[in-house]
Curated annotation (Swiss-Prot):
One of its GO terms (biological process) is 'de novo' cotranslational protein folding. Involved in protein export. Acts as a chaperone by maintaining the newly synthesized protein in an open conformation. Functions as a peptidyl-prolyl cis-trans isomerase. It holds the Pfam family Trigger_N. It is an enzyme of class 5 (isomerase). Consists of 3 domains; the N-terminus binds the ribosome, the middle domain has PPIase activity, while the C-terminus has intrinsic chaperone activity on its own. Belongs to the FKBP-type PPIase family. Tig subfamily. The lineage of its organism: Bacteria, Pseudomonadati, Spirochaetota, Spirochaetia, Leptospirales. This is Trigger factor. Residues 163-248 form the PPIase FKBP-type domain. Gene3D superfamilies: 3.10.50.40, Trigger factor ribosome-binding domain, Trigger factor, C-terminal domain. Its EC number is 5.2.1.8. One of its GO terms (molecular function) is ribosome binding.
């Protein structure tokens, strides 16, 4: 067998296989021998007919199988010799099949993505310094107090106020409708909590144990759950228990109870260090987004169509899973959101290409900078993760293996290592100091901002 290849400009390769008549004859013989094992010919038990009789019986009907065998075996013999590796087996076309003559088969196969990496060293980055104030530490201490708080029953005659905890029974239905369920129970409801429905808790202030109150509440028009947005619901609430939330005193005992610190000052030092590291990490991650954008804009990428198509489907199905939507096709999704299918496909294609660019940019940088990731590295990262969750490493590994997530976590840790390598290579200039509040505002901004 002879073969010729020609590289195209779109990450594909033209390949032409030329088989001699003797190659084709051998492929037919191999196919006849396979068929002989199961064929049933009158006068013989299944699989026992002589090979020459099998050949006469089947004749040219096995041509398709024989040619397929010829191509598969031929490709297997040259795969390691190809200058441009094949990422998937292509569909071959037979140019002209005539028994007893040479056979020519042609195909176009996809090869690896082609990445021409732009400048990634010495990129200039401005970084703000994170300034942790006493007020920031106070806020963290207050959060710790809330975590360690205990509840105590209020005395008879006392009523509910903001900051209290209540147990209640209630019924709810849309205005003008009949209640669908019997009464519901809600225990440990924190009055005045920032995540509660705005304007709801005010209806409960001043109530005592055993008191019942009926009232209406209208959800905002822009409420996240569309099925209740802008609608009015009628509530009937009975207070079953009423507690005061007792916060611990800010002292050395608080520090010891929280994490075993030997003093309050030691805990404050830990908080200051953790806040600084956490928000520096946040800034670094946001700056890395800008760095990758600059590298990608300066690089060239050629992806095989199958890469983009498969990644586009992956992005789409991830979105369906994340938003807990029913399993639907992209066509049905386009109809559901009332958009043109081509527009939706293009949107997911763009997302897919962006993900591929990030992935292969990391791979290329890792290759050039010789970034490796060993099983020892992986175990060390898993150990840190298990420690942060306060669970044994063996339990974490068991959960990851159960969810088939080990490879995903390995890839994520490796990507993080490449990111750290890249960040070390950029030119960093530290500018003004930002408070924790300012850093939060900066991290919440979607648009790129130079600090």
């Amino acid at each position: 067998m002879d073969y010729k290849t020609k590289k195209n400009s779109n990450a594909t390769v033209d390949i032409k296989l030329t088989f001699e008549a003797s190659d084709l004859e051998k492929a037919f013989d191999k196919t006849y021998a396979e068929k002989q094992k199961n064929i049933k010919i009158p006068g013989f038990r299944p699989g026992k007919a002589p090979l020459n009789m099998v050949k006469r019986h089947l004749g040219d009907t096995v041509a398709s199988d024989a040619i397929n065998t010829l191509i598969v075996d031929g490709m297997a013999s040259i795969l390691t010799k190809l200058e441009h590796p094949m990422v998937r087996f292509p569909k071959f076309e037979i140019q002209d099949y005539q028994p007893g003559k040479n056979l020519i088969a042609t195909a176009v196969y996809e090869t690896n993505p082609e990445i021409t990496l732009g400048k990634y060293k010495k990129i200039k980055v401005k970084l703000p310094e994170v300034s942790v104030s006493d007020s920031d530490i106070f806020d963290e201490i207050e959060n710790i107090r809330k975590q360690l708080a205990r509840k105590q029953l209020k005395e008879d005659g006392q009523t509910a106020a903001s900051g209290d905890i209540i147990d209640m029974e209630y019924t709810v239905c849309e205005k003008g409708q009949e209640p669908k369920n019997a009464s519901n129970t809600s225990n440990d409801y924190h009055l005045g909590h920032e995540n509660n429905l705005k304007g709801f808790d005010e209806n409960l202030y001043g109530l005592g144990v055993g008191d019942r109150k009926e009232f209406s509440h209208t959800f905002p028009e822009d409420y996240l759950q569309n099925e209740v947005a802008g609608k009015t619901f009628e509530y009937s609430v009975t207070i079953k228990a009423l507690y005061v939330n007792i916060l611990p005193t800010v002292d050395d005992d608080l520090a010891a109870e929280f994490d075993g610190s030997d003093s309050l000052n030691t805990l404050k030092d830990k908080i200051r260090k953790n806040l600084k590291e956490r928000f520096e990490e946040g800034i670094r991650n946001k700056k890395l987004e800008e760095i990758f954008k600059e590298i990608i804009d300066d690089s060239k990428y050629i992806f095989p169509d199958s890469y983009v198509k498969e990644e586009s489907e992956h992005v789409f199905h991830n979105m369906i899973h994340e938003f807990k939507l029913p399993h639907i096709t992209m066509e049905k999704y386009a109809k559901m959101i009332k958009k043109d299918l081509k527009e939706v496909q293009e949107s997911f294609r763009n997302l897919a290409e962006n993900r591929l660019k990030h992935f292969f940019t990391r791979q290329k940088i890792a290759e050039i900078e010789n970034v490796t990731y060993t099983e020892t590295d992986f175990d060390a990262d898993l150990e840190k993760l298990a420690s942060s969750y306060q669970i044994p490493l063996s339990d974490l590994k068991e959960e990851l293996e159960k969810g088939k997530l080990m490879d995903q976590y390995r890839e994520n840790f490796f990507a993080k290592k490449v990111d750290h390598t890249l960040f070390d290579l950029v030119e960093k200039k530290y500018t003004n100091k930002l408070s924790i509040g300012q850093v939060k505002d900066y991290l919440n901004q979607k648009e790129e901002q130079k600090v």
